Amino acid sequence: MSSAITALTPNQVNDELNKMQAFIRKEAEEKAKEIQLKADQEYEIEKTNIVRNETNNIDGNFKSKLKKAMLSQQITKSTIANKMRLKVLSAREQSLDGIFEETKEKLSGIANNRDEYKPILQSLIVEALLKLLEPKAIVKALERDVDLIESMKDDIMREYGEKAQRAPLEEIVISNDYLNKDLVSGGVVVSNASDKIEINNTLEERLKLLSEEALPAIRLELYGPSKTRKFFD
């Protein structure tokens, strides 16, 4: 008989993942400040060098040379500004990608904490079953999680029955086709008996979905609206 555990709702599972989003926001703010400061410094240095070089080149034909120098300076400044803008945009994307990658690596810490991971895993399985709504489900997991899932079967069936009501679940089969531990740190992939319908509820997939949903808002909050964008959703 398995011991009863406190199952998390899908919202509570999202709360756990949203903690990662808070971490992402904090890290991205710091990265954005560093990137902008560095870009401003590089811009001012390069602009100063250009002004100095152009001024030194002015000879007796002062007015003509000055006019040409100012035009050249304006063109060069515009080129530099565009180059710096592209550099900042590239650095921002790289920093956000790096932060999401760091957060992804921290997922293994959640899966290694059995007390924290167990209710999350049960909720991920139940959530996938509720999306599937099939009488028989095949659960693919990491090999190390098989015994844990076996111990939760009764709790999973009971919670599913309470929530699904008119779509009874007759059997849960734990597949011996295990998830790749090098690609997945936790969670499950659940499919129907024919394996034609599949629900990916791994921790990585949930973080990916969360990141895709959060990224536009994070960009807007950290960097402000795009000056070239005329319309917003």
Curated annotation (Swiss-Prot):
One of its GO terms (molecular function) is proton-transporting ATPase activity, rotational mechanism. Homodimer. V-ATPase is a heteromultimeric enzyme composed of a peripheral catalytic V1 complex (components A to H) attached to an integral membrane V0 proton pore complex (components: a, c, c', c'', d, e, f and VOA1). Interacts with VMA5; the interaction is direct. Interacts with VMA10; the interaction is direct. Interacts with RAV1 and RAV2 components of the RAVE complex, which are essential for the stability and assembly of V-ATPase. The modification N-acetylserine is found at residue 2. Residues 15-45 form a coiled coil. The keyword Coiled coil applies. It is a peripheral membrane protein. It comes from Saccharomyces cerevisiae (strain ATCC 204508 / S288c). Belongs to the V-ATPase E subunit family. Residues 19-38 are annotated as: Interaction with VMA10. Changing residue 202 to A: Increases ATPase activity 2.1-fold by increasing Vmax for ATP hydrolysis 2-fold. Reduces ATPase activity by 90% and produces structurally aberrant V-ATPase complexes. One of its GO terms (biological process) is vacuolar acidification. Present with 16134 molecules/cell in log phase SD medium. This is V-type proton ATPase subunit E. Changing residue 2 to A: Reduces ATPase activity by 11%. GO terms for cellular component: fungal-type vacuole membrane; Golgi membrane; membrane raft; proton-transporting V-type ATPase complex; vacuolar proton-transporting V-type ATPase complex; vacuolar proton-transporting V-type ATPase, V1 domain.
